[in-house]
Structures are given as structure tokens and as C-alpha cells.
Amino acid sequence: MATVIAAHFVSRSSHLSIHALETKANNLSHTGPWTQTITPNGLRSLNTMDKLQMKTQSKAVKKVSATGNGRPAAKIICGHGMNLIFVGAEVGPWSKTGGLGDVLGGLPPAMAARGHRVMTVSPRYDQYKDAWDTSVSVEIKIGDRIETVRFFHSYKRGVDRVFVDHPMFLEKVWGKTGSKIYGPRAGLDYQDNQLRFSLLCLAALEAPRVLNLNSSKNFSGPYGEEVAFIANDWHTALLPCYLKAIYQPMGIYKHAKVAFCIHNIAYQGRFAFSDFPRLNLPDKFKSSFDFIDGYEKPVKGRKINWMKAGILESDRVLTVSPYYAQEVISGVERGVELDNFIRKTGIAGIINGMDVQEWNPVTDKYIDIHYDATTVMDAKPLLKEALQAEVGLPVDRNVPLIGFIGRLEEQKGSDIFVAAISQLVEHNVQIVILGTGKKKFEKQIEHLEVLYPDKARGVAKFNVPLAHMITAGADFMLVPSRFEPCGLIQLHAMRYGTVPIVASTGGLVDTVKEGYTGFQMGALHVECDKIDSADVAAIVKTVARALGTYATAALREMILNCMAQDLSWKGPARMWEKMLLDLEVTGSEPGTEGEEIAPLAKENVPTP
């Protein structure tokens, strides 16, 4: 049992110092404090006329604080388990560009189902319809300015979903969360991303202390300070640094611990070394950030590396599959120059689960015929015909159909797949590709219909219904990733009895067993600036091998093996619990097996 004291509704004690990182970005270099107005729609930048009203409100708040007329302290008794705070730049379905958003969408409810108290903290990029203003704000000192952030909250599937409201998040990607989280377009970052994600880290350290949340029947009041933070990817790498540099020296979060999870080591947060003083960290942290590489971006030579610091300053380092954990310490190529540091700290890999509520062939709202393992062989030919008709291919249930769903970029190997199609269509086969990404790749797949009108189709759109139709209607799902920390497409495919054909990398090795639940083609080259002919040959050879099993008893057995697996978050949640208990945060207790509280009401959430 844990006892905490719930106190206030507005925090004014968090004047955490951090220098402005981009003095000219986004008009942040105004004279004097930069203020915001608080509206039902969140924080917006103030015009000059609004500032008088803001001063009046500020005086009123100070008067209430001085007279002690705020909400009185209350003794709150909480349930058992752990207090877990997941922090990330994305959380599905509210904001998602890939696996990071899926993990923060799916793992926290699974941990809550085991009896733990769970919060996620992420930016409020949009006016999420089911996230409500808590009326709690904190003031964070950034350089010589005081920035106000406000917290919005939604309680879903046993998880406190907390969103950090600030103009740097809300005004940047208004209405287009999915495509503009990190930059105005693919491959281009915002110039003030260091400032944005520093603010996220500081706000995440405040949220467990100041938010008085009472949505759960088992928990109420603030989370307190005996918590385990789970920081995700480079955007949250400053969290353990600020914890050690600012909070713990003041006696705050004395027993808190941080687990740092790497979702994709290719994205590290490398910036000019001259930016380090702007992070407002003591010089003793400089060595954790110090990094030299051979690239000229963002500057040539010495840099700071956020992910390196997150790895070195956290209490535990994890990633999203056991095989990927082996890969990132195998050498410079797959460890992307951080392999030496990870070998020193150690790393554990826990495979991801998947959302078995959204992706369920028994209840899927996007397919006309529902099925399970007992009816799959009758249902899939009909679903294939529906898919063929939808994309304009000749309707023939006897033609093997291969699907591809994913981002059109080098990591996912979409360019290698397209290069192999001219050889693949020599077989009796149809191919359907769905994805968005780099414009040159989108044009490539859209041109497939012209080149192979009876054999291939490419759809360069974000199309959720079609993704479900491909997953259900295809016979095989191709996942030719150059590297893949975990991967979700192969999990979705197996859940629907669609046999995956995968590159032998990362989580694809852990989840797809050769000859039992799919086909392995071997590891592809990780260089993204060219297509290796050996990789094209590997795809062609492995696809031919898979097609050789079509309409055989061997393929039927594979289909049933795929569908017999438990691909939910239950198993991964047990492993995460064990790892987090090993952090030995005061008051932590094991959880119990349980079911998720309720499905996520996605109709109340704007489409990411």
C-alpha cells in the first residue's frame, strides 16, 4: 500500500532552468517573458492586449496562494503494484508515426490490467476530443523566461493519458498530427526540436507530483515521487539527466528510477556541441552527451548526442526485441555508433505485443467476412476476391496474392521490393502495396498499375480500411526491412492467418519462425543509399519458395500455427513488470493477471 498527500491544483514551484535552444525559431526570441493565454482549446500565444488580463489573473492566483484558500491537503490511500510513468513523443492513437506510438498505446493498458497505476505523458499536438483540461498548469523556467505548460487528461483502459499543452506543440501541427510531429515534412526537422522535447521532459517530471487524478476506483490523488519513469527514444533522453541534476539534489524523486527504451537506434538526436550549455545541465553531464562522428549534419565534427546521454544516465536500457538487442551491440553498422556504450550499460530486449482488439478477424469492422482458425480456409478466398475487386485486379481466388503495408522508405525495404517486382510477376502472382512516404517511392508504386495491369497495384494513401482488407485477403505478407527493431505488420498478418515473408533482422527473427509461421530471407544490407542486387535476389528466391507451398497442406499448417499464437501485450507486460521490479523503486509490488478494463473508444479520438 502507498500513502500520498494530495495538495494543490496549480503548481508554482517548478521554476526549472533551461536555456532557450533556438532563439529565433518560431518567434520565441521576444523581449521579456513569453506568455500564453489559457482557453478551453489550450494554450495559445498572447497578443499584446491579452497581457493585462494575464497579469490580473496572476495576481489573483498569488492572493489565493497567500491566504491559503486553495484545495486542502488530503490523505489518499492507493492500491498495490507500481507507479509507472511512460513518456514519449507519440502515443497511439492520438499521435503516431510508427512503432513508438503503437507501444505507448498498447503496453500501458496491459500494465494497468496487471494492477499497476499507469500514466503516459506526451505532447498535445491537437485538440483531442476526449482529453479534458485539468486546470493544472506548471511554470517551467527556460533560460530567462518562465514558460507555462498546462495538462490535459483522458482516462482510457485503466491508463491516465496526460497531454502536455504548449504552443510549441499545438500550433506547429494543427490538424495534421500524424505528419508533422517532428518536422514540416518527411526528412526535415523543426529547428527548435531540442526546446520542444526538453519541455516535454520537464513537464513529465512534474505531472506525477501535481496532477490529482481520481478516474480509477483503485487509485486516487497524485502519483507521488516513488515512481518508475519509462523514457522512450531520444526525445525523452533528457529526463534522467534532469532527474539527477535538478530534482534529486533537492530531495525530490529520491527513489525514482528511469528505464530507457530504444525503439529505433537510427534516430539519436545529434546536435551541435555548442548547444550543450543551453540544456542547463552541470558540466559533469557533458561527457554523457559528447559525440564525434563523420557526418556533416547538423554540423561537422563534435556534437551532442541525446540518445547516448539517455543510455548512460538511465538505470536500465531496453529495446523492443531480443534479437534487436543483439544487433545494436554487434558493431558500428547496426549499433549506429552507439554499440560501445550499450555494451557497457547492457541492454535487454522485450518483444512488442499488438492491439488484439483492433486487429481481430472475428470482429474486424473493415472486412465483410469474419473468421477464426476453424473457418479461415473458407473465409480467406472470399476476402481475397473482395480485395482484388477493391484495388482493380482481376478477381481470381486461385492466384496467390502478396501484400505489403508500410512506410515507403529505405528502412522498410520498399525500394528493394519494387526493384524485385519485375522478376516476381513472372510467377502466377498478384501484388498489392499500400503505404505513404517519400514522394519518389509513392510515384514508383502508383506506376505499377501501368507496368503490370493484371499483376500489381500500388496505393500511396493512408487508408486504414484497405490495410485491414490486405491483411485479411492476402495469402502472404512481405516485410523486407533493412532493419526492424520489432515490427507490427508481421504480427497483424499472423493474427489473420496471412503468412509473413520477412527479412532476418530485429523482431522479425524473434516473431517469425522459418517453416513454422513464415519464411525468412536472410539479413539484407543496411546501407540505404543504394539497392544491392543480392537483396533483390533474396526477395525473389524466398517469394518463389513461399509460392511453392501455395494450396498445400504445409501452408495450411503454417496458417493455423500463425493463428494459434497469443500475440497480445499480456506476455510482454509480464516481462516488462519483471524488469521494472528489478529497479527496486520503493513501494513497488508485483501485479496480477487481469484483463484490460475497456476497449479504447477510438471514435472519440481524431484520426491520427
UniProtKB/Swiss-Prot annotation:
It comes from Manihot esculenta (Cassava). Its main location: plastid. Belongs to the glycosyltransferase 1 family. Bacterial/plant glycogen synthase subfamily. It is found in: Plastid, Chloroplast; Plastid, Amyloplast. Its EC number is 2.4.1.242. The gene is WAXY. PANTHER family: GRANULE-BOUND STARCH SYNTHASE 1, CHLOROPLASTIC/AMYLOPLASTIC, GRANULE-BOUND STARCH SYNTHASE 1, CHLOROPLASTIC_AMYLOPLASTIC. It catalyses: an NDP-alpha-D-glucose + [(1->4)-alpha-D-glucosyl](n) = [(1->4)-alpha-D-glucosyl](n+1) + a ribonucleoside 5'-diphosphate + H(+). This is Granule-bound starch synthase 1, chloroplastic/amyloplastic. The keyword Transferase applies. One of its GO terms (biological process) is starch biosynthetic process. Gene3D superfamilies: Glycogen Phosphorylase B. Keywords: Amyloplast, Chloroplast, Glycosyltransferase, Plastid, Starch biosynthesis, Transferase, Transit peptide. HAMAP family: Glycogen_synth. Pathway: Glycan biosynthesis; starch biosynthesis. ADP-alpha-D-glucose binds at K96.
